[in-house]
Every structure is written in C-alpha cells, then in structure tokens.
Amino acid sequence: MPLTRFGFIVTGDDFVQRTGTERFRMKVVGVRSPEQGIAAAREMVAEGIQLIELCGGFSPVWAGKIIEAIDYAVPVGVVAYGPESITGMARLFPG
C-alpha cells in the first residue's frame, strides 16, 4: 500500500493546513505545546493519516506519549537535530 496520507505536527502556533494532489495528501497541524500533539495525532489517525512526523520540538518522551495515545495505530517519526543544533534548539524551545 503506497503512502497517500501524511501528517506533520509542529510546535509553534495553532493552525491546520492541508495540501496535496489527487494521489497524495498532507495535513500539517501546529500546536502550542507537546501536550496538544496528542489530540492532533488522534484526529489524524481518525482521518486516515497513514504516517505522522513530529517536529524536532517534540522530545523522545513526548513522541512516546503520542505513540501510546494513538495505540500504535500508525508509524510516528521525529525530526532529529545533531549536536551542532543543541544551542539553537534550546533558544527556540526553552525548558
């Protein structure tokens, strides 16, 4: 089965954006906190999203919580940043 429905959750501001073609659809959801990512992921699964990617603002702990919250229904990946990005990421995502 080919990937035809992709979801991306980013921390920042609340928004929903959809784009795609007749053969591929993408939904991008912005959330203000990692906690809100759980509801966004559940909604994506309910809509038939086949794969969810989380922005680098989600820690491995939050990725695990989201995976558990959707009961492992679809694969969930996390964007990763190398050691050279640690200082910059700390400025963007304090605490």
Residue ranges and their predicted role:
Residues 60-84:
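Alpha-helix-loop-beta-strand connector modules within alpha/beta enzyme cores
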Residues 14-18, 86:
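Short, charged/polar "capping" segments at the starts of alpha-helices
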Residues 6-8, 27, 53-54, 76-78:
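Hydrophobic faces of well-ordered beta-strands that scaffold small-molecule active sites
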Residues 22-35:
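Active-site mouth loops of central-metabolism enzymes
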Residues 39, 84-90:
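Short, charged, surface-exposed secondary-structure boundary motifs
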Residues 37-60:
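Amphipathic, hydrophobic secondary-structure cores in small proteins
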Residues 2-4, 48-50, 72-74:
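Short, well-ordered coil/turn segments that N-cap beta-strands
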Residues 1-14:
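N-terminal basic/disordered segments at the start of proteins
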